[in-house]
Amino acid sequence: MVPVNEDLQTSAPRRDGGAGHVAESAAGRLSEDRDARQGEDMPQHGHLVVEARAAGFWRRALRHPGFVVGSLLVLALVLMAGVSAFWTPYGPEDLDMEAVLEPSSAAHWLGTDAFGRDVASLLLLGAQASLLAGVIAVGIGLGAGLLLGLLAAARPGRVQGLIMRTADFMLAFPAILTAIMLTAVFGAGLGNAIVAVGIYNIPSFVRITRAAAAGVWSREYAMAARACGLGPWQITWRHVLPNILPLLLVQATVRFAVAILAEAALSFLGFGVQPPQPSWGRMLADAQSVLFEAPLQALWPGLAIMLAVLGLNLLGDGLRDLLDPKLRRR
């Protein structure tokens, strides 16, 4: 028998082991390079995902008839208010006693009222009061209601009980009655009317925010975040608030419509916009005395209020259908 060199026997495994080590090292480097490339591509891919979701949202929105019609009506309201801020055919104090209750003409597109004022100009200027009332009143209600609702959800117990019982007490009174009481205390005027409507909006946002936030607090990821040591307000900011914003957006459109109705009602009763500043509600009040002589005087402001409220409600329903995952699956 030929003797086998022991050095050769021991060197073979070493060569195999070295080759395996080199292969493993190369595979490790390839894996690290692949992970690095994936890490570099992640921001770009994330950006593409966001763009795809946004494009998908707008495709669904354009196929939703209620959202489209509501958006057009709300856009018309904004355009009326914006145009009237820079230009109107006549001013609110331009009186022509020789052209009282005239029908539509080239000089006065929608005729004149009982004081000889141009109805089209008053209608355009009245959109400013309605839009301003809606924006500020909803801002007051949403800002205060969101903070109080989140506080009630994050602090169950006495704090939650005090906040919710106060909201229930405020909701026990009719909306217009509450607004009239507040304007009677603070005085008539557009500013006080807007504040009154905004205060009444607070309890509605408190209830909705508290209920939605409490549902998020009961989810597993919120409980896991608490177990990891995050504080209540950190969890609220990172997890609760992003999940309830779509619901609050839908509610804001509904309360916007309520604010326009409330401002028109207060102005109609004499607690809102004061003459000579125009308001759709004030135009309805002025048209009462000439309702049988010139019924169109009441038609135009009433139609404007109806279309504005209808547009906001359709927009809110469309947003709810588009943002609610349960409704999207149907």
Regions found by a protein language model. Name each.
Residues 59-74, 131, 135, 292-299:
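Membrane-interface helix starts
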Residues 199-200, 246-256, 295-330:
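C-terminal transmembrane helix and the adjacent membrane-cytosol boundary/short C-terminal tail
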Residues 119-151:
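Transmembrane alpha-helix signature in integral membrane proteins
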Residues 109, 113, 119, 143, ...:
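Generic hydrophobic transmembrane alpha-helix motif, especially the helices
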Residues 1-72, 314-330:
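Transmembrane alpha-helical segments of polytopic membrane transport and secretion proteins
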Residues 171, 182-185, 197, 212-213, ...:
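Glycine-rich helix-loop "coupling/hinge" segments at transmembrane-helix boundaries
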Residues 5-7, 28, 72, 76, ...:
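Hydrophobic alpha-helical transmembrane segments of membrane transport/permease proteins
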